[in-house]
Amino acid sequence: MYNMRRLSLSPTFSMGFHLLVTVSLLFSHVDHVIAETEMEGEGNETGECTGSYYCKKGVILPIWEPQDPSFGDKIARATVYFVAMVYMFLGVSIIADRFMSSIEVITSQEKEITIKKPNGETTKTTVRIWNETVSNLTLMALGSSAPEILLSVIEVCGHNFTAGDLGPSTIVGSAAFNMFIIIALCVYVVPDGETRKIKHLRVFFVTAAWSIFAYTWLYIILSVISPGVVEVWEGLLTFFFFPICVVFAWVADRRLLFYKYVYKRYRAGKQRGMIIEHEGDRPSSKTEIEMDGKVVNSHVENFLDGALVLEVDERDQDDEEARREMARILKELKQKHPDKEIEQLIELANYQVLSQQQKSRAFYRIQATRLMTGAGNILKRHAADQARKAVSMHEVNTEVTENDPVSKIFFEQGTYQCLENCGTVALTIIRRGGDLTNTVFVDFRTEDGTANAGSDYEFTEGTVVFKPGDTQKEIRVGIIDDDIFEEDENFLVHLSNVKVSSEASEDGILEANHVSTLACLGSPSTATVTIFDDDHAGIFTFEEPVTHVSESIGIMEVKVLRTSGARGNVIVPYKTIEGTARGGGEDFEDTCGELEFQNDEIVKTISVKVIDDEEYEKNKTFFLEIGEPRLVEMSEKKALLLNELGGFTITGKYLFGQPVFRKVHAREHPILSTVITIADEYDDKQPLTSKEEEERRIAEMGRPILGEHTKLEVIIEESYEFKSTVDKLIKKTNLALVVGTNSWREQFIEAITVSAGEDDDDDECGEEKLPSCFDYVMHFLTVFWKVLFAFVPPTEYWNGWACFIVSILMIGLLTAFIGDLASHFGCTIGLKDSVTAVVFVALGTSVPDTFASKVAATQDQYADASIGNVTGSNAVNVFLGIGVAWSIAAIYHAANGEQFKVSPGTLAFSVTLFTIFAFINVGVLLYRRRPEIGGELGGPRTAKLLTSCLFVLLWLLYIFFSSLEAYCHIKGF
């Protein structure tokens, strides 16, 4: 009805939960009746064994008078307290969402380091400032356990520094819930046949050992060292175990104890930004790498310190690997959805990469909270927002270009080419933007380059007038032809002195100081005109020796230029040659053929098909080569009689292996052009006359030849657009950007917006899903908290620390209300604080973690995010929650000459029971790593069901025996 699939748990968990609530409520009333009958013989002892119906004043909430209401009023009061407590739990979950967002931003901070290789080459890369293990045990654990920790501290400080049952029992109860129920759920929800293993097993061993030690330590200080009294040194040592635990976990993560005595070498990996660690004997040669001025080698003390965290082991995902993965995803999406726009492909790729990316505990906690409160799937919302921003930015840029208020005047091209015999060359001037109703004037003037005015071209200057509505004008410059062999020459044409005329101006032309606001020169404002000589058959060459092409170009076109003349028809052969790039359709398609230049034709193109592999990085080469040019219709025994006077042109015939020329009409001294055939019996050995020598020299000067660049190296590179898209996506797939906020406006919009939750089909290509009924219900239930906590500073400020500080203060305030409500709820129905804490408060504070672990178990590749942090969080709860509270209270009482007394009974019994069950839990998890199951989570259905049932049973037994001890049915310590 309410789309409850989003909150569905295992049947085992649901059954256990309902059984627990029923048993607890019945238990409380039975215990109360039994305790009353026992009171007559047991005197004051029973005061600790029964739940009191008389409430005490809370830290914030007063007592609800009268103290002895009727049965109906008790039900009403209990309902009010329970509903208020649940509503406060919702508020804590939402502010904890902000809190975890700030932690994600803080722990995602990076720093740039410089790596200097042995050859002197330097590269830059980024590393995270926070070590993953350290952040998980400090900020992450604090974020997920803040309510329990603060409840313990506030309870002690708010009740005149006396020990209470609510805080410590909540911590122990929460630990039991995390250890048994959450892990049972994670084992069960993994799809049948799939497994999840803990990747960092060393860290798990250390945190599990510290977790069990933490609760063993509580028993020792309560029942062994100083029974019933917590001394100052015990409280402080409990607190200082926290940093010691963090250091031990960090040492295990960094492998610093045993590995310190193994020589380590570091080398730069083949991929940029990657540092690879080696272990073994010390080499004889010096192969050190410097990073930030430090020589990286094992004999350098304290290199791997906490300030500079180098990701050198196998757990780190290299930036280049991430980019290649993004490139692969984009390629697959293009093939799968060829009809989609690039913005849609970016959205799909962004969501897919974010879904597959390894995520922190904070992210899963945030995701779970937002799904529960109708805030939607954070990944899909982020991907859609990024795509919309990309489209809007494109529209804005287009609009700005089209609506530019200033008219730009510029040449259509920066370079123009023409033949010497063309007569005139035309240059186009463009007017773009601004008010087209104005009249714009612009001057132009030619300037000598290697070509000279008067002998090569006609000097030209003047003014171009753009009338209202005109956007394009043409100017012409005369070109002077001659019969002299010469190099290609060029001259310049400049635009200057833009003026604007409008009806508003009195004299018709605006003053110069106002022109720039209406019209100005654009780029290019200078054009270069190259004159190709037409008195020669031509020199054939590529434009440059090397060219770079994108693999996405499809068909690449390479120009072959004909310079220093363009007379006659010439054939130029060409072919491709393999280099590191392979032909045959692997990297390019083999191409060969001939280019035929017609008379006066100065450029031809060669087309080669390049294969698009859509690689993020590519650098392969092949070559394109042109052969010796030859004239069309060659004959070895033909020649042309040349006169001393007049012009000539190529006939396509050869004399003594050289081109034969003929006279050209309409020259200075025109004569008839006649082709003369030399007799076959002509003797090649006969001495040439001086006239024939001159003819031969001229023929030699005019034959087609190869130029400087006859072999072009083609370098195939990755697509710039494709690489740019990947780089942008890589930046957008930072989870800190996904969960963080940049402004209060963004937070308030998010607070009042209802979004669709998770989809079962996960149809990434479907239309955007509408919110369900459940999403609307949860949104309206939590909208007050969402709007209230939208006032918390965005994570953009102070790199997340402003949000961190304000959020933890808000959590503390709500936790104080929860403590009072839980205590009053318990006393109203006759439950002891210890039972209320273990059952209700621990459950309420652990619900977001439960769903976070469920999502992590199904989506993550490893089990670390779902259960790996449970053990560390349990240890941190004791060391911070109980350590801080008891240290403060012990110091306060010691300063007053008193002792800080803590009853060891219920707490010590619960701790001992939890420790025994925790050993069983860890043992079962380690056994599941055997090949027949394959991992801590998942596996065959039977194994999953048995494991989940066992863990749920352990939790029920823990609750059952703790309640029996609390009500004195069994003897504790």
UniProtKB/Swiss-Prot annotation:
A biological process term (GO) from this entry: negative regulation of intracellular signal transduction
Binding of Ca(2+) 5, residues: 551, 613, 615, 718
Alpha- repeat coordinates: 141-181, 842-878
SUPFAM superfamilies named among the record's database cross-references: CalX-like
GO function term, MF aspect, one: transmembrane transporter binding
Membrane-related topology note: Multi-pass membrane protein
Annotated binding of Ca(2+) 4, by residue: 456, 482, 486, 489
Record topology, Extracellular segments: 36-74, 158-170, 226-231, 822-824, 896-906, 966-973
Domain notes: The cytoplasmic Calx-beta domains bind the regulatory Ca(2+). The first Calx-beta domain can bind up to four Ca(2+) ions. The second domain can bind another two Ca(2+) ions that are essential for calcium-regulated ion exchange.
The name this protein goes by in its record: Sodium/calcium exchanger 1
Species this chain originates from: Homo sapiens
Taxonomic lineage of the native organism: Eukaryota, Metazoa, Chordata, Craniata, Vertebrata
Gene that encodes it: SLC8A1
